[in-house]
Amino acid sequence: MEPIYEGKAKRLYTTDNPNVLRMEYKDDATAGNGAKKAQFENKGRMNKAITLVIYRMLESKGVKTHLVADVDDINIDVKKVSILPLEVIVRNIAAGSFSRRMGVKEGTPFKKPIVEFSYKDDSLGDPFINDDYAREMNAATEEECVFLKNQARIVNDVLIDFFKQVGLTLVDFKIEFGRLAEDPSQIVLADEISPDTCRLWDIKTGEKMDKDRFRQDLGNVMEAYEEVLSRLQNKA
């Protein structure tokens, strides 16, 4: 295996199959586009395990992902994709950047989920864009933007119910998609779904169970991740 990419939270390696990559989850934590950094023991293991449970569940509901196989505590094999330069964000309750941008009190539920795009470019601060921007930046076609939003809404509906069953409120989340290397006409869910990419609040207490514990210096970051993993594995 040869390393071919390293991001903030994961590394990618080649495998014997040119259309399959090995994805390794790191213990690194970042916030503010990398301005704040730390390492947490077992973070990679927990995020990998949480993503695996969620992706398998989504696959069972008909959502196509890049998942191929579980490998070990911190590695999975995934289909090789060309990641679209878009983060697709779904918001059910006001929090984070939405509350800051729009002056809406954190915890305010939305009448309907809000779906947003952000353009993946750290040097620009990952700006929020609309479908027209995405088209002009060659990030996605109009048809692909419609597909991405529809897929995001489907994922949201499934995840809301899934997390509710384990006592968690899905506040918001971001996901990424990629074109399959072996068939670029197919776009699948890629990257990860974990407390790094979701806001999850305990239904009974309202306690934050996600990366906001790191962003906001709330402490007990890994204890929260471990609790999320435990609930999901007991449910699965």
Curated annotation (Swiss-Prot):
Cite the annotated pathway: Purine metabolism; IMP biosynthesis via de novo pathway; 5-amino-1-(5-phospho-D-ribosyl)imidazole-4-carboxamide from 5-amino-1-(5-phospho-D-ribosyl)imidazole-4-carboxylate: step 1/2
Give the domain of life: Bacteria
Q: What is its EC number?
A: 6.3.2.6
Keyword annotations: ATP-binding, Ligase, Nucleotide-binding, Purine biosynthesis
- Which Pfam family, giving just one, matches this sequence? SAICAR_synt
Give the protein family: Belongs to the SAICAR synthetase family.
PANTHER family xref list: MULTIFUNCTIONAL PROTEIN ADE2 (PTHR43599), SI:DKEY-6E2.2 (PTHR43599:SF3)
Designated name of the protein: Phosphoribosylaminoimidazole-succinocarboxamide synthase
Please name the taxonomic classification of the source: Bacteria, Pseudomonadati, Verrucomicrobiota, Verrucomicrobiia, Verrucomicrobiales
Gene designation: purC
